Amino acid sequence: MYGKMKEHLSKTLAEIKEAGLYKEERLIESAQQAAITVKGKEVLNFCANNYLGLSNHPRLIAAAQKIMERRGYGMSSVRFICGTQDIHKELEAAISDYFKTEDTILYAACFDANGGVFEPLFTEEDAIISDSLNHASIIDGVRLCKAKRYRYANADMTELEKCLQEAQAQRFRIIVTDGVFSMDGNVAPMDKICDLAEKYDALVMVDESHSAGVVGATGHGVSELYDTYGRVDIYTGTLGKAFGGALGGFTTGRKEIIDLLRQRSRPYLFSNSLAPGIIGASLEVFKMLKESNSLHDKLVENVNYFRDKMTAAGFDIKPTQSAICAVMLYDAKLSQIYAARMQEEGIYVTGFYYPVVPKDQARIRVQISAGHNKEHLDKCIAAFIKVGKELGTKVSHPNK
């Protein structure tokens, strides 16, 4: 039987390669940080989710080592059998405090948090209204649920209102959105979303994976940015981006929602508990963020500097308040060539093109970190300018 399947798989893989969509894993020979080692050469990393520069922070490493000496390496159990230590509850409390919510539940990843949130809470009597650019984990989570599904164009409040009107016959309605959308870096208009939710009696859920630690006056996410505390019912997020970059996800929000997820959310019930080392380091992250806003301030300074310099150089960058800067090139082939040349110049970036982004919307996504210094940013900007001149690139939109 496998001979027949192998033929099918080989054909599928060949088609993926022919379409230019085959993903290669690029090996890093150093710790994850602003300057990394690839093939024995130091390059500057501008494609990591390491927004606060904490992935290799000495305080996190020391905290992980210390907690492993006290609590061991792994848990070898799910949470409800013998996989919950006191430190797991401490981290859940720290996350609740950070987001100003009532309770929190930890998962192995945010993919699991989003995959396990809908099915326990909603049935065919209910409606889930989702932004068209929401993360794949939200899409998959919704698919596991029998609720009626609606989708509105990215951040389009007119379409969202129409969906809410159509869903009025359903028992419960929930609006689901990313806080920051990963390809454009744009921020969901949470104030307007909450206004519509209140007008049409709907719940609100936001995935803070790319926004927590990044947006808002002190980096506390979209509810801080738009002052929607108390108006959002469910937050999901990750420990794998701004909060240290290791592993782990969470859902935080109303107490009764979290209580039911502990009873019925399958990724929580049937997955191993997060390892003590990750818990210890994550607790140190939230301690650091409570002590000072310096990392967030540095991130904002870096983002503004990069955007201003790139715009002055003539590049077309999507407007955003996040740490994701989409440098628009529009042409798919050009984005691939450009990214490859940038890597030759010692700048690690990635080109994105259809079908990951819409046709004729190819771009290079640059992710800024508090771990970058001015010299790193200047080198990246200089490389963009140099490669652009080499390729004869018109960096503004062809229709402008």
Which positions does each model-derived feature cover?
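N-terminal "arm"/small-domain region of PLP-dependent enzymes with the aminotransferase-like
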Residues: K6-Y73, A202
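PLP-dependent enzyme catalytic core of the Aspartate aminotransferase-like
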Residues: P58, A62-K66, R70, A93, ...
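Short loop-beta-helix segment that forms the pyridoxal 5′-phosphate
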Residues: V78-T84, E92-G116
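Conserved PLP-anchoring active-site segment centered on the Schiff-base-forming lysine
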Residues: V117-A136
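Active-site phosphate-binding strand-loop segment of PLP-dependent enzymes
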Residues: Y150, N154-V206
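Active-site PLP attachment segment
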Residues: T218, E224-L260
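PLP-dependent aminotransferase class I/II
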Residues: F243-M310, F315-K318
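Conserved PLP-binding catalytic core of the aspartate aminotransferase-like
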Residues: D297-F306, T311-G346, V356, D360-Q361, ...
